[in-house]
From Swiss-Prot:
Its EC number is 3.2.1.196. The active site is at residues 336, 371. Coiled coil: none annotated. HAMAP family: GlgX. The keyword Hydrolase applies. Residues 458-467 have a biased composition (Basic and acidic residues). Removes maltotriose and maltotetraose chains that are attached by 1,6-alpha-linkage to the limit dextrin main chain, generating a debranched limit dextrin. InterPro entries: GlgX_C (IPR040784), GlgX_Isoamylase_N_E_set (IPR044505), Glyco_hydro_13_cat_dom (IPR006047), Glyco_hydro_13_N (IPR004193), Glyco_hydro_b (IPR013780), Glycogen_debranch_bac (IPR022844), Glycogen_debranch_GlgX (IPR011837), Glycoside_hydrolase_SF (IPR017853). PANTHER family: GLYCOGEN DEBRANCHING ENZYME. It comes from Shigella sonnei (strain Ss046). This is Glycogen debranching enzyme. The gene is glgX.
Amino acid sequence: MTRLAIGKPAPLGAHYDGQGVNFTLFSAHAERVELCVFDANGQEHRYDLPGHSGDIWHGYLPDARPGLRYGYRVHGPWQPAEGHRFNPAKLLIDPCARQIEGEFKDNPLLHAGHNEPDYRDNAAIAPKCVVVVDHYDWEDDAPPRTPWGSTIIYEAHVKGLTYLHPEIPVEIRGTYKALGHPVMINYLKQLGITALELLPVAQFASEPRLQRMGLSNYWGYNPVAMFALHPAYACSPETALHEFRDAIKALHKAGIEVILDIVLNHSAELDLDGPLFSLRGIDNRSYYWIREDGDYHNWTGCGNTLNLSHPAVVDYACACLRYWVETCHVDGFRFDLAAVMGRTPEFRQDAPLFTAIQNCPVLSQVKLIAEPWDIALGGYQVGNFPPLFAEWNDHFRDAARRFWLHYDLPLGAFAGRFAASSDVFKRNGRLPSAAINLVTAHDGFTLRDCVCFNHKHNEANGEENRDGTNNNYSNNHGKEGLGGSLDLVERRRDSIHALLTTLLLSQGTPMLLAGDEHGHSQHGNNNAYCQDNQLTWLDWSQASSGLTAFTAALIHLRKRIPALVENRWWEEGDGNVRWLNRYAQPLSTDEWQNGPKQLQILLSDRFLIAINATLEVTEIVLPAGEWHAIPPFAGEDNPVITAVWQGPAHGLCVFQR
């Protein structure tokens, strides 16, 4: 058998140099590593990696070419109590593989064993890594680098966004290619979006439990190969990377950034009864947080937690992030359950991964957004991330819903959230843009469902409606479900308008959930992670054009208001904001805490948001000057020029003078 040359210990992964392929793999506790190469007939050829530099195993295979299929068998101790679960009978995926061939099916051969090792060989059915070559013409592509103060984020699912779009060619609907289609780009531009945030596109697997129920992991928060694109979103798996980069290049030409939702907190190997794909068999003790009994710390709710304080795992995470920036030109990341990134195991702002990102000349220059919590003790860290990060602002979400749908939030609390939650984020030199304001997200009710359902309806998920949060702050306006009388429909519409206006005209960075501007409903399912069907796909034929136009007008109005785009904290007397009561007078201390839900917010001394969140029609006396109701509020209900606004119940209007 041909012996491998020693090769080089860097970079990690499999890299073709024109003459052959260099293979590298980290494992601090392995005793031997075999590279397994598969020919066109599926015949396996094994080679010991001869190089061992520190904890990096490496070797060079001359004459190997792109398209080569490979995997690893890693030898070492089976000592579960010590956290070691080596099993060379199982073929393992390279954590840095750029392409995977094969499916991650629910198969007992893809398990290593719980207390005792399963020595049945699984190479015949295990997915294989594929060596790829990186040639792509980016032409004159350049990142838009939209200032944070001008950023409008649109959270979308690659498939769900375009799968039912009638104006996109059938053969590319639901794919990376569709993201770059002129129809999609023109829509995003007309809406006013500056950043498209995609749910996970790194290759993921469906949990065995879901597969047994005939379901699949739709959202993608179950990663198995962090450097590989999910092939199901490609027209052809072999060209996935090319298609993805084509889409990014087209979006960049239109001035739209691309932000990836990335999962660095756990892997698809789940708990100890979960499948064995890669990390568990390569170096379980290093990659995961291990308890004293050898089991996993489950700080993610997914069975395991990546140890992002381990130097090698930090290097792996940074290499992954740099890959997406340098190879795919993405403009930033949203980090799922990002508190895990700072665990040492306690959360620290100077945790190793945070420090590495801060010191990286590539990663420190892109947009970084944290979902600032995990499920463990001390996991709620909203406002505590390092200055480079923006954070999902759940304070804003809950306050907006409580104010408009539950009517139980004082004006002072509402104003605090409207002003970028300065009590939470104004620290360590951070700017208002650090607050990623949202009313809805992929996780939870859609905006329409917020006004149509009091209770979640997740029966289709197969967990007897136990999954998903019960804390929704929603209001069905008197009838559970969609449809209803004209009066009911109008009241729900008014609430949607109020929530959208609050989101898009408040200080901070707004994030809009794709489909909310259409009136998309998931029929009360607030945890549709496993629903790859018409429940989650956006139905463009049923989209509300009026609501879409309303949303677009709000976004374009936002861009005209200096107080919202200059990204400076509002200070008393700086002309950015004045808070007034229904008589155009400054609010008293008592009104802030106990007053009626009526408020006027004067922005940049020229734009006025008049709010009547009470149950009664109320006269709102506008400040001195000639005020014009402006789109999307100008119309028969709001006089073109007025000094007094007849504020409808649960209504609001925006004026300019």
